[in-house]
Amino acid sequence: ADIGNPKKFNKELEKKYNIQLNDLLSVRSFLDHNRIFEMPNIKNFDLDKITTKSTSAFCTNDTNKIFEPIIFKLSLIEHFQKWKPFISKYGLILLELHTINPKKCSLNIGKTLATAYDATHGFSNQYIIEYEDFIDSATIAGLKNNQAFEYNFPNDKLTTVSINLFSL
């Protein structure tokens, strides 16, 4: 199923297996940053209230146009909003990949795999964003991060891989 289209995924589950997506605990590993990019509807957001400190910039396959980091944060917010109706019962566990600020990376050589992640993902149209923006995007979308089930690797200061349990 297309991770970016939970409505269609739910319909397929109903048709094939007579089960609702909301009746399952949704668990995903490294899929959300690899979803098909959709340009966010910027008019739906108050850009004075949603910010990013991200230094990342990405382009998409169809246009090769470079977009500012805020575009990818807004796209992630919309992605999370699409999933809200389908995670209200049991929640959503995400194992996800993140980038970190290049300055922070340069001060921690050998302590993170951020450079390798950024290079491989940057050339394959996968949009990894900083952990702080990831959590903020989920919060803005109306998801709650259960910190009792939160894990950051290699640590809280250099998070390049996270595990989170989100609920409504």
Show which residues each predicted segment covers.
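Short alpha-helix
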Residues: 75-86, 122-146
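S-adenosyl-L-methionine
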Residues: 1-28
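Short glycine-dipeptide loop
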Residues: 52-56, 87-93
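Extended alpha-helical interface modules used as scaffolds for assembling large macromolecular complexes
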Residues: 111-121, 127-133, 148-154
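Core SAM-dependent methyltransferase catalytic element
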Residues: 16-17, 137-168
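Mobile active-site "lid"/loop adjacent to the S-adenosyl-L-methionine
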Residues: 27-75, 100-103
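Flexible loop/turn segments at secondary-structure boundaries
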Residues: 4-8, 33-38, 100-105, 154-160
